[in-house]
Amino acid sequence: MTLGSFRRGLLMLSVAFGLTRGDLAKPSKLVNCTCESPHCKRPFCQGSWCTVVLVREQGRHPQVYRGCGSLNQELCLGRPTEFLNHHCCYRSFCNHNVSLMLEATQTPSEEPEVDAHLPLILGPVLALPVLVALGALGLWRVRRRQEKQRDLHSDLGESSLILKASEQADSMLGDFLDSDCTTGSGSGLPFLVQRTVARQVALVECVGKGRYGEVWRGSWHGESVAVKIFSSRDEQSWFRETEIYNTVLLRHDNILGFIASDMTSRNSSTQLWLITHYHEHGSLYDFLQRQTLEPQLALRLAVSAACGLAHLHVEIFGTQGKPAIAHRDLKSRNVLVKSNLQCCIADLGLAVMHSQSSDYLDIGNNPRVGTKRYMAPEVLDEHIRTDCFESYKWTDIWAFGLVLWEIARRTIINGIVEDYRPPFYDMVPNDPSFEDMKKVVCVDQQTPTIPNRLAADPVLSGLAQMMRECWYPNPSARLTALRIKKTLQKLSHNPEKPKVIH
């Protein structure tokens, strides 16, 4: 037994049993990495570093695997051999475009001989871990075989649905998303189809920019889609939003429709794309600056937004269920207006999930904070209970009350309407600091002034009362999203079709 072959055996064993995947240790600082291997459940993963492994098994072509590592960092220091090359890097997605090579095949005489007693010494030491690993591998293969059998039926269904969509000239995207061709969550396309769609999207025009990056209108087989391109500093938001859309049942008329998520290389840099339905009216913030509203349209916008928030907040049980979700960055810029003049909620990059069955609160790993202008008093004075999911829902309700106020200002009553203004426009600067908002909301206990003219309309007076109940200083006294939804639906009893007043 030679030293080279002994080292190869240990390295191959480590790779074969996934010891660099980071499943056994909690990394202190996480990076996002491309994940391409049989055990990848998503096209990305998180770990302490990114890995690329090039392996050549006897009689086969070399195989490339990409993933994450959180332990066994000594493998990163190994030199390449004719069978294995293992590369580690420490920036997000640094393993996306790395190419490796194997050493030229060596003759046995080139490898130094190892002490003949070494196998006798190491044999008993290695026997137990090897047996345990082999048992684990056997169990994994059995489960993998069962999963493949289950997936076979869904894959066949997906293929037929994709062909059907290709044959129909109108609304290919609709055929994809309205069918059962999903990841199983009902939230988007299968991962391989997501990647295919992303590579077929052509960017047409930039329709928005912000601290997160840019939003483009794209074209896919003649249909418009929205492409949100995240900046490198906001990659955790992309990761979180992709994670939620791919694991949670979020198909709802009043939640922005998800299509695909992918990493692409443009101009020698990695771009993070989130592809969603395109809504030409843009955000509610943009819509309210351009349009004034009749009372019925104002209620239509409010009811639909409340329906989306209620769907996020509720936990649905069963095989097609979903955990409860709190948005944490609700504002008029993160609410879109659809062509039917209903709202849908977007941007889940800060969302928090909670499951009652496991009592697990999934906060994510995003250092970004919400928008200061829409922060609830308990967030500003740092008294929020971060270990309690209800606390996050209560902050959403505070912010939703501010969105209702923005809608109410642009509603025409007796021929009177105000210009669009953001909440607290007359109390804080255009870009308020944390301290600015804390003084106004917590110290002075101010809330936006509700227009007196709302009292002249029996329906909108109910909307005004709802705002006040969203802004109670005591978070637990605020309305729930479900109560807001039901109350608004009662107020909106008039079936007259809404109109936009220019």
Curated annotation (Swiss-Prot):
Gene that this polypeptide is encoded by: Acvrl1
Q: What is its EC number?
A: 2.7.11.30
Q: Which GO terms describe its molecular function?
A: activin binding; activin receptor activity, type I; ATP binding; BMP receptor activity; metal ion binding; protein kinase binding; SMAD binding; transforming growth factor beta binding
User: What does the UniProt keyword field contain?
Assistant: Angiogenesis, ATP-binding, Cell membrane, Disulfide bond, Glycoprotein, Kinase, Magnesium, Manganese, Membrane, Metal-binding, Nucleotide-binding, Phosphoprotein, Receptor, Serine/threonine-protein kinase, Signal, Transferase, Transmembrane, Transmembrane helix
Q: Which residues lie on this side of the membrane: Cytoplasmic?
A: 141-502
Q: Which family does it belong to?
A: Belongs to the protein kinase superfamily. TKL Ser/Thr protein kinase family. TGFB receptor subfamily.
EC class: transferase
Record the organism. Answer: Mus musculus (Mouse)
Tell me what this protein is called.
Answer: Activin receptor type-1-like
The record's Gene Ontology cellular component field reads: cell surface; plasma membrane
Where does it localize? Cell membrane
Question: Active site located where?
Answer: D329
